[in-house]
Amino acid sequence: MERTTNFNAGPAALPLEVLQKAQKEFIDFNESGMSVMELSHRSKEYEAVHQKAKSLLIELMGIPEDYDILFLQGGASLQFSMLPMNFLTPEKTAHFVMTGAWSEKALAETKLFGNTSITATSETDNYSYIPEVDLTDVKDGAYLHITSNNTIFGTQWQEFPNSPIPLVADMSSDILSRKIDVSKFDVIYGGAQKNLGPSGVTVVIMKKSWLQNENANVPKILKYSTHVKADSLYNTPPTFAIYMLSLVLEWLKENGGVEAVEQRNEQKAQVLYSCIDESNGFYKGHARKDSRSRMNVTFTLRDDELTKTFVQKAKDAKMIGLGGHRSVGGCRASIYNAVSLEDCEKLAAFMKKFQQENE
């Protein structure tokens, strides 16, 4: 079977080796006589999967000992509510850097629980860049929230701010795509369905000391401390999604770890951005060059009809997921960790040929 090249924004491409291993273990996991999907979350077989996923995250990301790792449900969208529910108090303000739709959603949820402030925004330029951040007025804030990569607009933080208050990052779309200093953040969270595995599990990495500030009057299942104490087993976890997460992390380790994948991601992005920049305006990048994402390459063509033709012809060539979001229009190539350099070279060759045929 010829595999389709998957440029979807999420759920996104998974490594073929991971899919093949999951296929092999789907019926009989480790000679247990059961599918991995049938394992009790209290069994020793699943416990090994659970702990393996945690230990691989610690190893690959260099997570310090003073952090907890949680596997939760509800997607990153639930974190938009859980964070202020647990950590925003009446006398404090949650500060936001607005860089796209996901920042807007996080801000909207936080407003339901307390005071918020927009520290910086690039909304007036349709979120085409990461704004400069002045942190002089946030010293008494509850936390500063950022979105590390913006899938819709194709922008990404190149350097993270040195925040005088707790720094919280939604890293759903670029976690483990590059080396970061975890110790700069009090909370990192992200849905798995872009770089970590299939949809269904949300990874939360939280500084242990931050739990001391947790609000008391919160439903038990929505308290972070509940899940820390239960090792993410307070209720039945998404066992298959966590199993797949462990396989993806294992694949990443076997392929050189984060340092190697970061180099590959830079090469992949450069192939596509060079194609855009050398097209004499046939393709126009949405993101400013100093804010370009290595995960989501966004670009427009001269009109909607040409864009539709581009997307359809790409689909005919077994490349899917290239339609842009309505906020930007045009096209978007999501090139997460599992998308290969060869996949990006195939797309670039298609783009050059399409330009020659339609100029």
Swiss-Prot record:
Signal peptide: none annotated. Its EC number is 2.6.1.52. L-glutamate binds at R42. Keywords: Amino-acid biosynthesis, Aminotransferase, Cytoplasm, Pyridoxal phosphate, Serine biosynthesis, Transferase. Pfam families: Aminotran_5. The modification N6-(pyridoxal phosphate)lysine is found at K194. GO terms for biological process: L-serine biosynthetic process. Its cofactor is pyridoxal 5'-phosphate. Pyridoxal 5'-phosphate binds at A76, S77, W102, T151, D170, Q193, N235, T236. It is found in: Cytoplasm. GO terms for molecular function: O-phospho-L-serine:2-oxoglutarate aminotransferase activity; pyridoxal phosphate binding. Pathway: Amino-acid biosynthesis; L-serine biosynthesis; L-serine from 3-phospho-D-glycerate: step 2/3; Cofactor biosynthesis; pyridoxine 5'-phosphate biosynthesis; pyridoxine 5'-phosphate from D-erythrose 4-phosphate: step 3/5. It catalyses: O-phospho-L-serine + 2-oxoglutarate = 3-phosphooxypyruvate + L-glutamate; 4-(phosphooxy)-L-threonine + 2-oxoglutarate = (R)-3-hydroxy-2-oxo-4-phosphooxybutanoate + L-glutamate. PROSITE patterns: AA_TRANSFER_CLASS_5. One of its GO terms (cellular component) is cytoplasm. HAMAP family: SerC_aminotrans_5. Homodimer. Catalyzes the reversible conversion of 3-phosphohydroxypyruvate to phosphoserine and of 3-hydroxy-2-oxo-4-phosphonooxybutanoate to phosphohydroxythreonine. NCBIfam families: PRK05355.1, serC_1. Belongs to the class-V pyridoxal-phosphate-dependent aminotransferase family. SerC subfamily. This is Phosphoserine aminotransferase. It comes from Bacillus subtilis (strain 168).
